[in-house]
From Swiss-Prot:
<dbReference type="GO" id="GO:0005634">
    <property type="term" value="C:nucleus"/>
</dbReference>
<comment type="similarity">
    <text>Belongs to the translin family.</text>
</comment>
<dbReference type="GO" id="GO:0006396">
    <property type="term" value="P:RNA processing"/>
</dbReference>
<dbReference type="Pfam" id="PF01997">
    <property type="entry name" value="Translin"/>
</dbReference>
<dbReference type="GO" id="GO:0003723">
    <property type="term" value="F:RNA binding"/>
</dbReference>
<dbReference type="GO" id="GO:0005829">
    <property type="term" value="C:cytosol"/>
</dbReference>
<dbReference type="InterPro" id="IPR016069">
    <property type="entry name" value="Translin_C"/>
</dbReference>
<dbReference type="GO" id="GO:0005737">
    <property type="term" value="C:cytoplasm"/>
</dbReference>
<dbReference type="GO" id="GO:0043565">
    <property type="term" value="F:sequence-specific DNA binding"/>
</dbReference>
<dbReference type="InterPro" id="IPR036081">
    <property type="entry name" value="Translin_sf"/>
</dbReference>
<protein>
    <recommendedName>
        <fullName>Translin-associated protein X homolog</fullName>
    </recommendedName>
</protein>
<dbReference type="GO" id="GO:0004521">
    <property type="term" value="F:RNA endonuclease activity"/>
</dbReference>
<dbReference type="InterPro" id="IPR002848">
    <property type="entry name" value="Translin_fam"/>
</dbReference>
<dbReference type="InterPro" id="IPR016068">
    <property type="entry name" value="Translin_N"/>
</dbReference>
<keyword id="KW-0963">Cytoplasm</keyword>
<keyword id="KW-0539">Nucleus</keyword>
Length: 231
């Protein structure tokens, strides 16, 4: 009996040690992913949109993330990987947010869940939750740089964000805990979309005002002055 209890105690201790190691790896992935996102905001504001396909200024963080992901894959290898998914979900969500934001800055589109850019197999739930967070980065980017975009470009991004929200809100048969987290992220996403819509509407109004003022000036200018200006 004593040997059985000792064996069970060792099993629980090994389980706890593995969980703590996975949590540490997840935290490091989160930290490096946040640094990557911060640098993406800095460089995209100065380098313009879209970023070149061979953009590599975030490679210093990506290499660190890839190293942690390799360690995480080793820890998750085996039949009990699902048991530890909650220990690494936040790190993987942040990783998805960083990678998809970079891809959006390069292409203006969404990176697929199965794309080889991800250095680890991403489950669909972590992917969706990470993409929801990524829309907040798009909003922050457009708030800072919206004046550089045309009405057509801004309208395109509004449609893109609305489409993401629609697709994410239609996902069904989720565990109650995941469903609650998704609903919270969708609520934040709605606020982000509203801000981007506001940027777009303001741009439309400013351009309409300019056209109206130009028309007013043109109408008020005497014909003689118009002829002098044209010669």
């Amino acid at each position: 009996m004593e040997e059985e209890f000792l064996s069970f105690k060792n099993f629980l201790q090994e389980d706890q040690d593995k969980r703590e190691k996975i949590i540490r790896l997840s935290r490091e992935i989160t930290i490096q992913s946040k640094r990557m996102i911060f640098l993406l905001h800095q460089t995209s504001s100065s380098d313009g949109f879209p970023l070149p396909k061979d953009f590599d200024r975030t490679s210093i963080f990506e290499k660190k993330i890839h190293k942690e992901l390799e360690s995480l894959k080793r820890e998750l290898a085996g039949l009990n990987a699902d048991k530890f998914s909650s220990a690494c979900t936040h790190g993987l969500q942040e990783y998805v947010e960083a990678v998809t934001f970079k891809f959006w800055l390069q292409t203006g589109t969404l990176l697929s869940c199965k794309d080889s850019s991800f250095r680890i197999s991403i489950n669909f739930i972590d992917y969706v939750l990470g993409v929801c967070d990524m829309t907040g980065e798009i909003m922050r980017f457009l708030v800072t740089n919206g004046s550089k975009f045309s009405v057509q470009q801004l309208t395109q991004q509004v449609k893109f964000l609305r489409g993401l929200h629609k697709n994410c809100s239609e996902i069904e048969h989720l565990p109650s805990k995941v469903k609650s987290e998704l609903q919270q992220k969708l609520s934040v996403m709605e606020n982000s979309i509203s801000k981007v819509e506001g940027i777009c509407y303001s741009k439309i109004l400013r351009e309409a005002d300019k056209r109206y003022l130009n028309l007013e000036v043109d109408t008020a200018t005497p014909p003689e002055e118009k002829r002098l200006r044209s010669t």
